């Protein structure tokens, strides 16, 4: 299915329409096709792309609840708290433990992908379990 979508994206790449490859597994797909290459000289501790849960945002619900991700119950605070403290606090930090990703921690795309931890959570009730949509064989 991704291959068919990619063919359409390529067919219409010069049109005025921009196609967003938002799903994180596009990174793996494009990596395997040789379109995406991991740049040399990157910092090993930096997250460059992929799921942003815990990394650079949180969600504010209509009720003022702060969530690490909109796709599963990931409460980290409220808008009544100091946002700096919430962002750097232990509740949000638990989503930043990238070495805990069971499968992704061993993958060269860890800093660019990580699949969808919310899908993994929905499937296994474990945020750090493998995204069941990921086809990459590790090890």
Predicted feature locations:
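C-terminal accessory region of radical SAM enzymes
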Residues: 1-40, 65-115, 121
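Acidic, His- and aromatic-enriched active-site or binding-groove loops in soluble protein domains
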Residues: 41-48
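Short, small/polar residue-rich loop motifs at catalytic or cofactor-binding pockets
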Residues: 51-55
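Gly/Ser/Thr-rich beta-alpha loop segments that engage phosphate groups in nucleotides
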Residues: 56, 117
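Short, acidic, Ser/Thr-enriched surface-loop or helix-capping motifs
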Residues: 60-61
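Short Fe-S-cluster ligation motifs
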Residues: 104, 131-139
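Short linker/helix segments within small regulatory modules
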Residues: 124-128
């Amino acid at each position: 299915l991704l291959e068919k979508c990619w063919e359409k994206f390529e067919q219409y790449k010069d049109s005025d329409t921009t196609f967003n490859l938002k799903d994180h597994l596009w990174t793996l797909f494009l990596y395997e096709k040789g379109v995406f290459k991991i740049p040399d000289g990157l910092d090993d501790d930096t997250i460059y792309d992929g799921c942003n849960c815990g990394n650079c945002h949180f969600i504010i619900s209509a009720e003022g609840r702060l969530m690490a991700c909109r796709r599963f119950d990931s409460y980290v605070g409220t808008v009544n708290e100091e946002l700096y403290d919430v962002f750097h606090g232990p509740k949000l930090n638990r989503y930043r433990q990238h070495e805990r990703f069971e499968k992704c921690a061993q993958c060269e795309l860890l800093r660019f992908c990580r699949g969808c931890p919310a899908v993994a959570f929905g499937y296994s009730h474990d945020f750090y379990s493998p995204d069941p949509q990921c086809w990459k064989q590790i090890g």
